[in-house]
């Protein structure tokens, strides 16, 4: 089990806007190489991101599914990269003044990570998830806010 926290210098809504755009996942999720498709209903429960993980040309095609979500507060995912395994990943957002405390928790549910002791698995997951939250923060803090185009 890995649990990593970071304070992001923007609002929960801005962080959620990154989480809610499935096409952005390879920009901030360490190990995600590309997105092949995103269900139109993302990030609703049951929606999937169809991704590839690894380094080209050694890529694994699989998906990540939303198990639970509360817009602006929480998303719980089932991330797959078979035969490497599956994991449950929870990302929670808590307002902290004008900032957001973000916590990512990851727990392997199948594959090698599920049978190895946490003392073996956690250091690598923690290292990866520190970088994942760093990348998420860069996007949420610095991505321009787009205004709707005039319809008139």
Language-model segments: which ranges?
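Short glycine/serine/proline-enriched coil/turn segments at secondary-structure junctions
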Residues: 43, 56-58, 83-85
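Short beta-strand segments that buttress and anchor functional surface loops
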Residues: 48-54, 75-82
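Hydrophobic/aromatic beta-strand elements that line small-molecule binding cavities or substrate pockets
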Residues: 6, 53, 62-68, 79, ...
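Short, cysteine-centered beta-strand-loop-beta hairpins and adjacent loop/turn segments enriched
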Residues: 54-60, 110-113
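Intrinsic-disorder/low-complexity, polar/charged segments enriched in Ser/Thr/Lys/Arg/Asp/Glu/Gln
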Residues: 1-7, 13, 48, 61, ...
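A short, structured loop/turn motif at beta-sheet edges
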Residues: 12-13, 40-43, 67-72, 92-101
